[in-house]
Every structure is written in C-alpha cells, then in structure tokens.
C-alpha cells in the first residue's frame, strides 16, 4: 500500500543517516556480491568512546519450500582483541625493521672502507670474508624491506603514487637491479617486447618495479647455472598489459600454486634461501592497482609469473 511504502521510505532515510546502519547495509550488499573485494574486511563500530571490530556474517531467510526471501539475519562476532593483537604485531615488526636498517647501513659503510685500496689491499681470505659480509648484509636489507612493505599492507597504510610509465622502463629497472646476480650464475636474460607501439601504465612505478625485480630475482635463484630467463610484456585485445617472467628451473607443484602467495609460505623441500614474503607482498601491490598476479608452472618445466594491469 501507499502507507507501507511511505513508512519504508522513512525507515530507509533514517537508516542512511545512521552511521552504524549504513555500514551494516553496505556490509549486507558486499556479502552477496561476488565481485566485492571488501566482504572479508572487519566492520568497525565506534561506541562508548572506543572503536570495536566485528566479523560480519549474513544469511538470507525465507519460508521453507519457498524461493522467496523474507529478509536477512546479520551475525556480528567481536574480534577487537584479535585485531588489537594483530595491530601490535604489525607495529612491532615495523619498528624492528626500521631499527635494523641503521646498523646494517653502518656495516655496509664500514665494508666499503675496508675494500678501499687506499686503506690497504685484502688477501684472498679477507676478500671472501668481505664478500660474505656483503651478501648477508644485502639479504638482511632485503628482508627488512619486505617486512616494511608487509606492515604497510597489513596496517592499511599502503599509499600509491601513480604516474604514467612505460612497461619497458619497469622491465629495464628489474634487469639492472638483478644484473650482478645473473652474471654470478652466468644466466642469460632475454627480453621479449613487441616492436609495435604498446600502451602506457598509470601505476606506482616504484612498487610495480619492486614486483618485477622480486620475480626476476626469484627466477635467477631457482634457475640452474648457465640457464636462461625470459622477461617481457604484451598487450591484450581487451587493453590489458601483461608483464611476465619465465624461468626453466625446477618448477612448482600445482598443489602449491595458491599457497605460494601467502605470507611466510615456502614450498616444502626448498633449499633456496628466502623469507616467504616476496610473492605475497607482490600480489598485494598488484591487486592494490586493480590487477592480478598469477603463476603457470609444472614440475620439471619451470615457472611463468604474469602480472596483469590495465593500460
């Protein structure tokens, strides 16, 4: 009736003015939207002068034997304590990572002084020791960088600074960053880039370059000596740009194709050193741009990682 419709409109307007009800309605809409990326995010409610976090679960209700729905039931589980613990963990990791960078930088500066011929030449044993210090310091810097990137993502403070970038510039940066590592194992890096004009990207070039650098570094570490790696880009008919890194190493068991993008996961039996963070951070960075990062791999046939971004 007109009266019931009028009352419904009044209630709807009141609900939209109420912050809590508005958030519940938005959460209800996201819960049944397959394309929504925020359906698993906790619901934040401010009451009694404090913030509380809830996990929201929605269910449709209706008469038995009828396909017609009568309404929804919303269940809220208070996860504030877990959220606070997770936040404390993220803050701790971020603080420790920042604190580690200073002594590592001091070690590297001291190492440069030791290797300066004006101070005095090193014998072969001392050169090996200096190289070991360099390698381990670089590894520590890489780990602290990954931890800082992870805390940015987990705390929701990931800030993108997009600018117009050519895909080839990102590829060249990744190759330059990994050149010494590739030469060390005598690995040839081939570039596949179409001669025809390719679209440009509007992305945070530092973060996407970091992703490509990480993928190329992984490919080198998991390749045999005297091997080869292909890095390149292509544009699809639906105007997406795909950048890929292909190696011809051991490959990844299909059982682990999803797990390798999780924090700290490492394929069982892996002997190559790593933190288990690089791929998960890479995936977060790419998805923050509205893109995807996927893997195509079989045991004994190598791996191909592809990131898709809108041109």
Predicted regions mapped to residue ranges:
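Short alpha-helical segment of the dimerization/phosphotransfer core of two-component systems
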Residues: 135-140
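Short helix N-cap motif at coil->helix boundaries in the Bergerat
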Residues: 167, 251-259
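Single conserved hydrophobic/aromatic residue that forms the stacking wall/gate
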Residues: 1-11
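Conserved catalytic submotifs in the C-terminal HATPase_c
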Residues: 127, 161-166, 183, 188-199
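Primarily the dimerization/phosphotransfer
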Residues: 73, 79-119
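PAS-family sensory/regulatory modules and their coupling/dimerization elements
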Residues: 12-81
């Amino acid at each position: 009736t007109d009266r019931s419709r009028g009352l419904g409109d009044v209630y709807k307007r009141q609900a939209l003015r109420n912050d809590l009800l508005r958030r519940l309605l938005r959460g209800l809409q996201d819960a049944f939207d397959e394309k929504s990326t925020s359906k698993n995010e906790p619901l934040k409610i401010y009451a009694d002068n404090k913030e509380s976090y809830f996990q929201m679960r929605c269910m449709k209700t209706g008469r038995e034997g009828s396909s017609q729905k009568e309404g929804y039931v919303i269940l809220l589980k208070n996860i504030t304590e877990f959220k606070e613990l997770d936040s404390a963990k993220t803050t701790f990791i971020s603080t420790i990572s920042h604190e580690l960078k200073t002594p590592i930088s001091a070690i590297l500066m001291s190492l440069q002084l030791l290797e300066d011929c004006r101070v005095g030449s090193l014998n072969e044993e001392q050169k090996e020791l200096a190289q070991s210090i360099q390698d381990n310091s670089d590894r520590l810097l890489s780990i602290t960088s990954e931890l800082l990137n992870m805390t940015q993502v987990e705390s929701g403070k990931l800030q993108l600074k997009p600018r117009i970038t050519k895909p080839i510039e990102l590829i060249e940066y990744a190759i330059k960053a990994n050149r010494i590592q590739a030469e060390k194992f005598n690995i040839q890096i081939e570039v596949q880039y179409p001669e025809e004009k390719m679209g440009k990207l509007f992305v945070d070039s530092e973060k996407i370059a970091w992703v490509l650098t990480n993928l190329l570094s992984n490919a080198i570490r998991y390749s045999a000596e005297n091997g080869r790696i292909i890095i390149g880009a292509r544009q699809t008919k639906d105007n997406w740009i795909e950048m890929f890194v292909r190696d011809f190493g051991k490959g990844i068991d299909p059982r682990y194709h999803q797990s390798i993008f999780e924090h700290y996961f490492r394929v069982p039996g892996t002997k190559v050193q790593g933190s288990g963070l690089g791929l998960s951070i890479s995936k977060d960075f790419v998805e923050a741009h509205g893109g995807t990062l996927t893997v195509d791999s079989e045991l004994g046939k190598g791996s191909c990682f592809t990131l898709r971004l809108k041109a």
